[in-house]
Amino acid sequence: MKKKISIERISAELDTDRPIWAAVGDLCCRTGDGGDPIPNERWELFTRIWIEPYRVLMPEWSYVALADRRVVGYLTGCPDTARFARRCFVRCTLPLLRQVVCGRYRGDAYGKRFARQTLRLENRAERSFPRPIRRQLLRQFPAHLHMNVDAEFRRGGVGRRLIDRFIQDLRQRRVSGVHLFCGAAPVPFYTCVDFHELAVISVRGNPVYAMVLRL
């Protein structure tokens, strides 16, 4: 029997939604390698990079898809990427960088890459786009999102419903547009939910797309 899916916005009360955030982090790691799981030993660092900033800084701009109260999809995002990035650097990135440099994640190549990117010794995918493109994204499409759906629940409309709810709330705030970065595989899905390609570059031999939606 098909399970009923509900879409819920996470509250700003961290204690209330702590189990939800744990489930979001778990799903992030189970889908973090192009939809497939990442190695178990990388889970803690991976969630600190990709989930913690949203949990700490803007939990109210994150959403979950629930089936029988189980998290089967999530969307993390914010309405103002430039402001979010400044706060994230101070509150999340710098403390994590200190721990990486001091050896907390010794042996994790992902930790080394995070440190190199934070110190601007290596560009993150989004910083590899030409400066005019990055400026256009922040000016015309200031919101951004990340999203993952459990493999069992893909192609069932869960992703579209998460995005629709996020966009509805952005429009209430009169945000002008939203962007995201992704590889080649999700492009057809995002095209189906009205995003279009603004630019594409190659990063370490793989295409990275900047997808945008004007609100």
Language model features with spans:
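Glycine-rich phosphate/pyrophosphate-binding loop shared by adenosine-nucleotide-utilizing enzymes
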Residues: I5, R69-Y74
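Conserved GNAT acetyl-CoA-binding A-motif
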Residues: F141-A143, M147, L170-G183
